[in-house]
Regions:
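PLD/PLD-like phosphodiesterase catalytic module centered on the HKD motif
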Residues: 1-157, 165, 169, 177-179, ...
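Glycine-rich phosphate-binding "P-loop"
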Residues: 133-163, 318-343
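Structured alpha-helical segments in the cores of large, soluble enzyme domains
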Residues: 160-171, 342-350
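Structural motif
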Residues: 184-187, 212-214, 362-367
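Interdomain helical connector at the RecA1-RecA2 junction of SF1/SF2 helicase-like NTPases
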Residues: 297-301
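Extended, charge-rich helix/loop segments that form flexible
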Residues: 305-320
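Beta-propeller domains
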Residues: 318-389
Length: 554
């Protein structure tokens, strides 16, 4: 849901997801004098009387205990975009934007603008979407749980999962005696999900599993051991023998009548069935309640269950599920599967990215195909649009680029935290993957956004060698806004941490510092980059995101 309101020289737009709201605003030039930032007050939910949104950075003269957050009417937001990630789904809220004026030690509020919204429901056919929180390396986790290992702390697990575990369980719980679950899974590990599948089988559901299997592969040994331990009959399971990765994480739900499966829905996304995947790594679960979509996933499953080799699958997909072309390019929902005999799916993604007219934001886990990375980065004479990106590890395009209106960052944590911040840890995590979703969102501030999301890492291996699946969804603002709120949550969280550790990458994006402190500017000079040059990306962001297009982009 999106709403825009203008009053007293202010324009405020809210983009509502399920568990997050993104706010963007603009202020007329005449409001800049002595402007030290903005406060935001939210009404509704658990605080009908109103509560100030908070931040972690104050003015130089303000000191606070490490990890304590500050109300924005005391330490205002020195930006024209902010996120609220304390909302609940399907709930009414009102946001009030308040300019705050000098002096810093006795801030004066200006005239306000406000707007209302209702956050999106979690379960609305055809698309139900859940992101985990997955930021163990955060001030909020450190403040709540210290260095507690979530393996041993149920409250920490619940906070990190933020309902993604329940979301997966609820999909499996649909299955009973008149239904079936057909699964393709890379990592058959997490006890919670395994028990949910066994419970479905005990209720009478027909359960079949295709699992990743590669010679000499540690994951294969783990999968096979868990399959055996769970007692699945041999005719219900198939190893997906491959020299690469069976990287899908899909469950097809079907009704069964007269022994025939009638597919109704599919659960897909980026979430591996591991402790890391559910609790430490940023991931998404996405349910599509659509019989036609589920039928295509089931057809793919049947090929794998019948023992098709990777070569067989390349040929079968080329003949039966080609990359969209012609009139199919404009369909509101597209599916792309791999392995492909060529890089046609990657080239298709490059063409979609190149067609964006106003904005893009992405989050990816591993090294991207260079043509995909170049398209996301706006290289090669591409249209100048707002570009935001988060990669698990830094790449050649990481950092702030004014010329290309590009702000790309990588994950990080505050091992050497600023003063007044707590140290951050990832207790109990295996490996260093923090960002695991594979999402590209195009023209998100228009009436025709486009989402690309699934299991594929947009690499040559994911295209030509791995078993993967990807959704392309056009023109669904609800879906886009749910993803947008979470992408900006993760982008802003990690950008601050990466820039603190890599100040050269921040460029003009670098915030104020005072020795080992991150501080606000106690003068209105912070506004210069938003107003001095109309072509500066900060100025474009201020004008553009506060005024989303209500018609499809040209």
């Amino acid at each position: 849901m999106r709403n825009t309101a203008s009053d007293n020289g202010l324009t405020l737009t809210v983009y509502a997801g399920t568990t997050g709201v993104q706010l963007a605003w603009d202020a007329e030039e005449g409001l800049r004098e002595d402007l030290l930032g903005f406060a935001i007050k939210r009404y509704g939910g658990t605080h009908p009387e109103g509560a100030w949104l908070q931040g972690g950075i104050g003015f130089p003269a303000q000191h606070h205990p490490p990890g304590e957050f500050l109300d924005t009417h005391l330490a205002p937001i020195q930006a024209f975009r902010w996120g609220d990630y304390t909302v609940r789904p399907d709930t009414d809220y009102r946001y009030e934007l308040v300019p705050m004026y000098a002096p810093a030690d006795a801030l004066r509020p200006g005239a306000t603008a406000s707007t209302t919204l209702r956050t999106e429901k979690l379960d609305v056919a055809p698309h139900s979407i859940a992101f985990n929180r997955a930021v163990a390396a955060s001030q909020a986790y450190s403040r709540r749980f210290g260095e507690a290992d979530p393996h041993e702390n149920a409250a920490a697990r619940a906070w990190l999962a933020r309902g993604l575990d329940d979301f997966i369980d609820a999909f499996i719980a649909r299955a009973g005696g008149d239904s079936a679950l057909d699964i393709v899974i890379y990592e058959y590990e997490l006890e919670r999900i395994r028990q949910a599948l066994l419970a479905a089988a005990a209720r009478g559901a027909s359960v079949r599993i295709v699992y990743h299997a590669a010679s000499g592969d540690e994951q294969t040994a783990t999968n096979a051991a868990n399959i055996a331990a769970d007692g699945w009959p041999q005719d219900a399971v198939r190893p997906r023998v491959t020299s690469n990765i069976c990287h899908d994480k899909t469950i097809v739900f079907s009704r069964v009548a007269n022994g025939e499966r009638r597919p109704e829905a599919v659960l897909t996304g980026s979430t591996n069935w591991t402790f890391n995947g559910l609790y430490y790594q940023a991931n998404v679960g996405h349910v599509v309640d659509d019989g036609d979509v589920a039928r295509r996933y089931l057809a793919l499953f049947e090929q794998l269950f019948a023992g098709a080799t990777p070569s067989d699958m390349r040929a079968w997909l080329a003949d039966n599920d080609p990359v969209p072309s012609g009139a199919a390019v404009d369909e509101p929902l597209q599916l792309l599967f791999s392995p492909r005999p060529d890089r046609s799916d990657l080239d298709y993604y490059v063409s979609l990215i190149g067609g964006a007219t106003r904005s893009l934001i992405f989050a990816t886990a591993f090294d991207l195909d260079d043509a995909v990375l170049s398209a996301l980065a706006g290289e090669g004479g591409a249209r100048r649009i707002l570009r935001y990106g988060l990669q698990n590890s830094a790449s050649r395009v990481t950092g702030y680029n004014r010329e290309l209106a590009r702000n790309f960052t990588a994950t990080g944590r505050l091992r050497s935290a600023p003063d007044e911040f707590l140290q951050e840890h990832t207790p109990g995590q295996r490996g260093g993957i923090l960002m695991h979703a594979k999402v590209i969102l195009l023209d998100f501030d228009t009436a025709r956004p486009m989402l690309i999301s699934g299991s594929a890492n947009y690499s040559v291996d994911s295209s030509e060698n791995n078993d993967e699946n990807t959704l392309v969804i056009r023109g669904d603002a609800r879906v886009a806004d749910i993803y947008l709120a979470e992408l900006f949550r993760l982008f802003d969280h990690y950008r601050f941490r990466y820039n603190w550790s890599h100040p050269a990458a921040a460029g003009e994006e670098g915030g104020g510092t005072e020795a080992r402190r991150a501080v606000l500017d106690d003068t209105p000079a912070w506004t210069d980059r938003y107003y001095a040059d109309a072509n500066d990306p900060h100025a474009i962001e201020r004008r553009q995101l506060s005024r989303p297009l209500t018609a499809a982009p040209a």
